[in-house]
Every structure is written in C-alpha cells, then in structure tokens.
Amino acid sequence: MPLYRQESEWKRLGMELSRTTMANWIIIAAKEYFIPLVNRMHELMMKESHIHCDETPVQVLNEPGKKVTSKSYMWVYSSIKESKRSVKIFDYRPDRKATNPQEFLKGFGGTIITDGYYGYNHIDGVTNAYCWAHARRKFYDALPVDMKDASDTFANTAVEKIARLFAIEKQIETLSPDKKVKVRQEKSKPLVDDFFSW
C-alpha cells in the first residue's frame, strides 16, 4: 500500500504517522538489511555456471532529469532452474546501456542466456547462449498474418523446429540435471545441429 494511503489509514485510526517517517524507515531498513542481503545474493549468483538475463522497460514517475514518458529499465538476473540455489535479482537502471550488465556481471565466468540484445555481447569472460523462447518469438512475429496458410514459410519452419526442442524440454522437466544433459546430447543436439545447418 502506498505510504500516502498508510498515512491516511493511521490517521483514521487516531495515530499521527507521517509518510516521511515511514519513508525514512524504509530507507534505513534497505541500507541496514536489504542492500547487504542483495550483495550476498549477487556473490552467490556470480558462482553459478549459468545466469538468465533480461531487461524490461519500466516507466518511473518524477524521475530526476527524465521526461515522464521516457523509459527506465529493470534488469533481471536469475539462476537457472537446475541450480542448487534459486537466486533472482532485479537491478533498476535508468537506461539500457551495455555498461549495466557489464558492471553487474563483472567477474562472472559462465554462460549467460539472453534475448540477443547487443548489450550482452561485450562482457569479458562470458559465453552468451541465446534464449530459444526469444528466438521463437522473433520467428513467430515474422509469420505473415494475412496468409491463409503459412506452413511453407521460412518463419513457420523455424517455429516448428524450435517446438521440437521445447517438446523434449517438457519431457525431461523432472529429470536430474545430469540426466537432462544426457537426453539433450542424444535428442536435442541433433535438432540444434539441424537448425543451424538449415
């Protein structure tokens, strides 16, 4: 609940508690407890072998130096499903500059799974594995909407090929990470090789 509404609610109950006081409590709690916690989560994340990365626009009202209509970004970093620890960090930044993931991922030496945004391409020591879901969406968006039958199109063929990979992932969802790797090598790798040779 927004602080101005909490202030009204407390006043209705007979207590004078200003939103400034509550905002100060939040700031102190963040500095004392949440920032160290997020820093520890970041340390743990940097030890992972794979990290999902994605950035999404958000609109922030009354942000200093920016128009109300301008976009800011929430950069989301997440450990993979098979990780021993589930770590997700939301990193707010006022822009979409490549320096944002470079700073966040500094010292990481594993693989990042991304949507293909160029900002992830220049991070030292990192392997970039692009996300199949994002790739599928690009091909799906390229399907002609005015055609009665798009089955012979390049985009549809790509969507179908990626769907076969997704079907395998659905089948192995509950397997251990080691078993998933084995099945992926046996079943998914030939499909991926076919996709890139096609």
Language-model features: where?
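Catalytic center-proximal scaffold of phosphoryl-transfer enzymes
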Residues: M1-W198
